[in-house]
């Protein structure tokens, strides 16, 4: 997609600023790079990088990456993979790659995450018709389109009672006829 030299490709994006570049670059363990890994500070670019042999305690697994790094972990079973995810803070996104609909549905239904894709990445961000947002430490609320408006709006519920009418059955003592009368309107 970006050729043999993505750092030279004008269509390949860069990291947002020097501080974030340094943070993301610091997550790359050179001993675990199987693809990419090169970086150019002058243009704030980091090659798409795949890390293999990653352990849960590695730095790259301790925070959200927000960069072109894909850590690969190996699991013996779907149960092990699901437990790995659910035992940690809720991820911002989850990408499931499987042709098996049962596997897809299992992760979509039972694993908490902010948003995601099945057999793709990032595309849930690309439309203003779908909300995007995290849960827990990864943020709350939904952004994009109508969801942004709703998230950043505060809906206030107000009752404005007329002062000229005060119905006495609202107040104690609460006789059984008052309970019956109220239930007619409440239920």
Q: Across the structure, where does each feature detected by a protein language model lie?
A:
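Gly/Ser/Thr-rich phosphate-binding loop
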Residues: 2
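Cytochrome P450 C-terminal beta-domain/meander region
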Residues: 41-42
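Conserved C-terminal structural/oligomerization subdomain of aldehyde/semialdehyde dehydrogenase
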Residues: 12, 45-187
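Basic phosphate/pyrophosphate-binding loop/patch that engages nucleotide-derived ligands
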Residues: 22, 26-32
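An acidic site on a long C-lobe helix of protein kinase domains
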Residues: 20-23, 77
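PAS and related sensory helical modules
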Residues: 5-9
């Amino acid at each position: 997609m970006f050729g043999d030299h993505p750092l030279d490709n004008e269509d390949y994006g860069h990291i947002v600023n020097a501080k974030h570049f340094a943070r993301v670059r610091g997550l790359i363990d050179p001993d675990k790079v199987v693809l990419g890994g090169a970086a150019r500070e002058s243009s704030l670019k980091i090659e798409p990088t795949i890390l293999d042999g990653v352990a849960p305690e590695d730095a790259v697994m301790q925070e959200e990456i927000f960069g072109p790094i894909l850590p690969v972990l190996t699991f013996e079973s779907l149960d092990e993979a699901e437990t790995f995810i659910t035992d940690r803070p809720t991820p911002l996104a989850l990408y499931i790659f499987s042709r098996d609909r049962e596997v897809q549905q299992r992760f979509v239904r039972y694993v908490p995450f902010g948003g995601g894709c099945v057999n793709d990445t990032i595309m849930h961000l690309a439309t203003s018709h779908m909300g995007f947002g995290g849960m827990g430490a990864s943020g709350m609320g939904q952004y994009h389109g109508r969801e942004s408006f709703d998230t950043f709006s505060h809906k206030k519920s107000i009752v404005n009672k007329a002062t000229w009418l005060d119905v006495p059955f609202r107040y104690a003592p609460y006789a059984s006829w008052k309970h019956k009368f109220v239930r007619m309107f409440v239920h």
